[in-house]
């Protein structure tokens, strides 16, 4: 069985517009149309059995609507093969209430994205969210490292992760993009071997640049990718694509 642990979908009404914005920022080609149906089609084409959708809450007021969609997607899992995590924003003061709702709805975890939520990962608000999520037994996935759509400031660095690990001691923290996108030397030196998981999303292979786009970034080399796996342990690495 193949599980893609890191995917994204958008409501049909806004999928095209959202994907257009992401493409304009990243200068890369999408692999699907960003809809749930598009994800399911790509799963069939590539032989993926289960996909986990990781919603990103970019403003506090979005949390109720986004989590309602997550519940609906997850309720249809048997027929779709798609499971959704919940979302939360550091600006949500009622974070315990939100996390309790996510837990009671049967969702298995949450996604945090410090870049799109404009907060540093070692912010006390994230620490509180992660601490309570850990109490509830929820998985916490966080975008780690550079985001090519918002590259000017990195909101989740290996040093910030070390601080959270030392202070909060989360049991099920997953660092997307092999621990820190484009910061893999630091990840190797500071995070490999720590009590944390990493996913492979958008970390190995070739970037599908738009025609004429400046090739500013590269994914991890095969040598670095294997170094990270060997140093951290394959049992702590989760497969993910970052679809679309």
Report each predicted region and the residues it spans.
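Short, well-structured secondary-structure segments
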Residues: 47-62, 69-89, 111
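H/E-rich (His + Asp/Glu) clusters that bind or coordinate divalent metals
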Residues: 181-244
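Acidic (Asp/Glu)-rich catalytic clusters
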Residues: 40-47, 67-81, 97-107, 127-136, ...
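Hydrophobic faces of well-ordered beta-strands that scaffold small-molecule active sites
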Residues: 3-7, 50-54, 82-86, 108-112, ...
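Short aromatic-enriched loop/helix-cap "lid" or pocket-rim segments at secondary-structure transitions
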Residues: 13-18, 64-66, 98, 152-154, ...
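An N-terminally biased module of ancient metal coordination in phosphate/nucleic-acid-related enzymes
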Residues: 1-61
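Short, surface-exposed alpha-helical segments at coil->helix boundaries
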Residues: 33-37, 64-71, 158
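Divalent metal-binding pocket/active-site signature
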Residues: 32-33, 57-61, 90-93, 105-189
């Amino acid at each position: 069985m193949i599980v893609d642990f890191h995917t994204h979908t958008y409501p049909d009404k806004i999928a095209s517009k959202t994907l257009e914005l992401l493409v304009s920022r990243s200068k890369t080609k999408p692999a699907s149309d960003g809809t749930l149906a598009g994800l399911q089609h790509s799963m069939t084409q590539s032989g993926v059995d289960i996909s986990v959708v990781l919603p990103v809450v970019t403003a506090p007021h979005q949390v109720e609507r986004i989590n309602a969609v997550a519940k609906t997607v997850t309720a249809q899992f048997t027929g779709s093969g798609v499971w959704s995590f919940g979302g939360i924003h550091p600006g949500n003061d009622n974070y315990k209430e939100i996390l309790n709702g996510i837990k009671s709805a049967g969702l298995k975890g949450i996604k945090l994205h410090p870049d799109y939520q404009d907060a540093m990962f070692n912010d006390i608000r994230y620490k509180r969210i992660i601490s309570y999520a850990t109490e509830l037994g929820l998985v916490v996935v966080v975008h780690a490292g550079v985001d090519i759509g918002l590259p000017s400031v990195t909101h989740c660095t290996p040093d910030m992760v070390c601080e959270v690990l030392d202070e909060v001691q989360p049991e099920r923290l997953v660092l997307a993009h092999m621990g820190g996108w484009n910061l893999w030397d630091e990840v190797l030196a500071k995070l490999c071997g720590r009590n944390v998981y990493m996913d492979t999303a958008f970390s190995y292979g070739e970037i599908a640049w738009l025609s004429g786009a400046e090739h500013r970034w590269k994914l991890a080399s095969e040598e670095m990718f294997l170094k990270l796996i060997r140093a951290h342990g394959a049992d702590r690495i989760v497969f993910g694509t970052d679809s679309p």
